[in-house]
């Protein structure tokens, strides 16, 4: 199982260079996640929310910190049409192999980067009326459809990850990436189940707990 440190994990500043510096060489942390947008100057910057008139950390700065490391970076795209920008930036320093893309990702890129796209299932599934929960029948149908499009890894909230969905994914030979799992027992349970990736805000806390139990 990959363990991804959610932006701001373990009380580090969200979408910051301090966050990247803290986790870049931590054994057991496979991936760090940041939120990516494009500013009016055409630069990729880190922010979960819509941009305001202030300075943001540039993705290029964060990539410099990760240069020469083995850790991977999940760029959670908060806007559409950023895939090529991230690719071109990462390619400049031969870092594309370190990158995953999730969030607003076009399925058109599956033919080029099937192993590096974490496809967010919720982008395609309808809701049950006004309920915050989705239609599970539709979710299973969309799971099959995404598999037909070439998806390899399905990204979704662990709250929506049911036994039925797990069985369907297994039938389709799809892997799952679950977010944001902050119960340490749940992380361990998913690890034991062989989940492809778990994203958490308690990454180091989880690793430290597992070390104590050894």
Predicted ranges, named:
Residues 1-214:
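Phosphate-group recognition and catalysis centered on beta-loop-alpha active-site segments
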